[in-house]
């Protein structure tokens, strides 16, 4: 793991800083209640005794450049504005949301490939493996919070007003995900 850098936030996940504003909103009370319940249930996993270090925090397709060279695929990671010091497996949880969800559900072949590649470099502990569905769920709820904040509170966009609910459905599905291992 890379040594912690002074000044980086601790236990930050993309979308969590906006959650208090979302929780206070009365635009979608059912969503706000579900978000509050999920954060109360899942956030303790993020700050539990999992191995910690520097994480990217926003591993989605638009933050990756993939190119082939010499018969091998190479990945360049961009956009480190969400970087923080947190549970290392939290990055994997966010990557499951950003890279392995298709049509609102985890694509298990992609999940398996991501886990295999990750563990080829850094094996997960049993505790991390057990926490991963909760970390993925928390990541999806954090993204849902950001979408609500963005498309209802700061830049209202009626055509995107439903996206927070779609991500909430993803969160529930990721929490229920059973990992093979």
What are the language-model segments listed below?
Residues 32-42:
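Mechanochemical coupling/switch segment within NTP-driven translocation systems
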């Amino acid at each position: 793991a890379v040594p912690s850098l002074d000044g980086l936030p601790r236990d930050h996940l993309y979308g969590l800083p906006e959650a208090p504003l979302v929780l206070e909103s009365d635009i979608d009370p059912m969503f706000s209640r579900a978000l509050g319940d999920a954060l109360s249930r899942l956030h303790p996993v993020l700050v539990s005794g999992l191995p910690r270090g520097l994480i990217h925090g926003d591993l989605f397709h638009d933050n990756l450049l993939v190119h082939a060279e010499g018969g091998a695929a190479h990945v360049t990671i961009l956009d480190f504005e969400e970087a923080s010091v947190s549970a290392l497996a939290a990055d994997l949880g966010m990557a499951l949301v950003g890279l392995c969800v298709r049509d609102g559900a985890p694509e298990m072949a992609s999940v398996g490939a991501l886990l295999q590649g990750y563990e080829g470099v850094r094996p997960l502990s049993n505790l991390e493996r057990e926490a991963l569905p909760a970390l993925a769920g928390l990541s999806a709820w954090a993204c849902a919070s950001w979408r609500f904040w963005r498309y209802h509170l700061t830049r209202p966009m009626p055509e995107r007003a439903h996206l927070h609910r779609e991500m909430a459905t993803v969160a529930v599905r990721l929490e229920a995900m059973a990992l093979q291992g």
